[in-house]
């Protein structure tokens, strides 16, 4: 069964731009679709006060491989630079979970 991966980032200082997300997506080059990725979504949930990323993967191992091999090498230097800048709105997710899906459909 497919695996869901959810990340939620608290909206920082009222900033609802997608500058950080867009820069990371450009650097990761998602035109080269990661092996095992079935769907990727990202957007604001203003009621919850978060920017939410929701992915569905064939297996957790495929998702973790993408995160470790392609995503983290891009995020780690950005996070290190942001930690030195008190005005930065870059923050790690305040919620991050994996869970097995009972069912999924595409239309």
Question: Residue ranges of each PLM-predicted region?
Answer:
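Short S/T/G/P-rich N-terminal loop/turn motif that feeds into the first structured element of a domain
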Residues: 1-72, 83-107
